[in-house]
Amino acid sequence: MNKSDSFYNLETIGGILLFIAAVLAIIIANSPYRIGYDYFLSINGSVSVGNLSITKPLLLWINDGLMAIYFLLIGLEIKREVNRGILSDKTNLLVPALTALAGLLFPALIFIFFNAHHPVYLKGWAIPTATDIAFTLGIVSLLGSRVPFSLKILLTAIAIFDDIAAIVIIALFYTEQLSLLSLSLALVFTLILIGLNYFKCRRISVFMLFGVALWIAVLKSGVHATLAGIVIAMTIPDEGKESMLTRLEDGLHHWVVFLILPLFAFANAGVSFVGLDASMLTHPVVLGIGLGLFLGKQLGIFLSLGYFVQFKKFLKADKVNLAQVYGIALICGVGFTMSLFIGSLAYQNYDLSLMPMVKIGVVFGSFIAGLTGFLVLKMTSLKR
């Protein structure tokens, strides 16, 4: 099995586990065990080293700590793809990059349309711009060979650029008041990591030691701690067939797929439908997120792909029809983990009462987009 096959198989399993974890969280959130679920996520955990102590509830250890490892993996995958993967050929960059940009712009505009007159609500404009690569590839994989491999590659490339956009959005728009001392320490640790690469250090343990120090500095700086994972990834050496980057990526992938993302989904997807009424479904935040994911994503991605002459040649070469492209555009509306994550950042310092609305919008929008995308692909794709 080559690396591509292994990657897609893992993402398939990851998508299934995410679905199970999310459904389990929703079931518990609507059962008598809801109180225990909330209590479990609110348990404080502390880590102390000398005079330094960090205390956070379990939910934030997952969102700030474990998700930094997920972003480290994203960074490693992006670096690998740029160095020697689907993004290494610059002619392959334009279509997925501009498509991802359009797939970001349309959902954001829909969200802004519904929430323009609510300054606090408006802070969630980026929630429907995300695409969950594990969920989307998991859905596509259920159709097996019906979906051309080139479409899976295109979907992956769009999702990678989507992740890059999410990283930029978090850094620019969801950063708290900054601590110059902590930022300075973060810069020092970043320079040390760059130096380790430059002087040919190839011990993962040394990189991870300074990586943890960088994460703590970023956590204390006001910049979201998950971005430390991206910075660490960019400093990891990628030389030779069995490079340090490859070894670290392979080592992390299973942990992320089998533990971190399912745990994140379980901790964040617990939507309670008790007392749900039409007024909640028509809340501006719910409409902005749900319609942004379902309508915004499909409009942005399908219209932009249909525009490129270069892409039309690609369609003919691989016998891909526009209906299949439309199915892929729909599936890109499955924002799930990334949308929930951005939602937790958007309102954490303003109005936590909006989080149930975020969860309802993300769950409904992602479910409808994923289901309709699956049905469109199933009806328009022949077995190969």
Swiss-Prot record:
A GO term from the CC aspect: plasma membrane
Catalysed conversion reaction: Na(+)(in) + 2 H(+)(out) = Na(+)(out) + 2 H(+)(in)
GO BP of this protein: regulation of pH
Membrane topology: Multi-pass membrane protein
Coiled-coil positions: none
Keyword terms: Antiport, Cell inner membrane, Cell membrane, Ion transport, Membrane, Sodium, Sodium transport, Transmembrane, Transmembrane helix, Transport
Location in the cell: Cell inner membrane
Matches recorded under InterPro entries: Na/H_antiporter_dom_sf (IPR023171), NhaA (IPR004670)
Main location: membrane
Residue ranges of the TM segments: 9-29, 58-78, 94-114, 124-144, 153-173, 179-199, 204-224, 256-276, 285-305, 325-345, 357-377
Keyword Cell membrane: yes
Signal peptide stretch: none
GO molecular function: sodium:proton antiporter activity
Gene3D superfamilies noted in UniProt: Na+/H+ antiporter like domain
PANTHER family per the UniProt record, alphabetical: NA(+)_H(+) ANTIPORTER NHAA, SODIUM ION/PROTON ANTIPORTER NHAA-RELATED
Family: Belongs to the NhaA Na(+)/H(+) (TC 2.A.33) antiporter family.
Matches recorded under NCBIfam families: NhaA, PRK09560.1, PRK09561.1, PRK14854.1
Record function comment: Na(+)/H(+) antiporter that extrudes sodium in exchange for external protons.
Listed name of the protein: Na(+)/H(+) antiporter NhaA
Source organism of this protein record: Legionella pneumophila (strain Lens)
Gene this chain is encoded by: nhaA
